[in-house]
Amino acid sequence: MPDLSFSVDGAEAVSFAAAPLVSFKLRIRNANVSEQIQSILLRCQIQMETTKRRYSPKEQAQLFELFGEPERWGHTLRSMLWTHTSATVSPFQGETTVDMPVPCSFDFNIAATKYFAGLDDGVVPLNLMFSGTIFFETDDAGLQVEQISWDKEAPFKLPVSTWRDMMDHYYPNSAWLCLRRDVFER
């Protein structure tokens, strides 16, 4: 019976894609190193752990629209859902590393974009939460199916520069503009 653990070894912008992507290098380990994993249909929810970093006065001002006055951040600053993504993992034994693509754009998630854009530097603490289906061989060469336990998570500190470099690559010298509906309809 598989007992998987997950960690993130790094992240980088994908240079040649139809849409902006950040690729996370995901390491998957099975505690039973001799067990043959045939495939994993992996789902991942990524949360931005906004309370786990410090903010400069300039960043606090830039994040006002998301979190309000810094004096109220004890009540308004919360973890935010960034996105959901999925990946299919090929057969392995013991351990494997896979690329997990995460689509990004200015208009995909306005709150996430405002958050990333409001940071000058440093890292964005993330929590990747996994679920999905594992297909594995049994000792008698049968195939078993099992769900990934809901408690499987991996923290990662995404450099703000990774997101910024990706946006600069796909949207050079551009920014997303969010308009009120009445202004847009003119």
What are these regions (language model features)?
Residues 1-23:
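Low-complexity, acidic Ser/Thr/Pro/Gly-rich terminal tails and inter-domain linkers that flank the onset
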Residues 7-12, 27-28, 85-86, 110-113:
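Short structured motifs
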Residues 15-28, 37-46, 104-106, 172:
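Contiguous beta-strand segments within globular domains
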Residues 43-49, 99-144:
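Internal, hydrophobic beta-strand segments that form the core of beta-sheet-rich folds
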Residues 46-58:
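Short aromatic-acidic-glycine turn motif
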Residues 61-70, 135-172:
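Short beta-strand elements
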Residues 62-118:
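Extended, solvent-exposed segments with strong compositional bias
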Residues 169-186:
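Surface-exposed, Lys/Arg-rich phosphate-binding patches that contact polyanionic backbones
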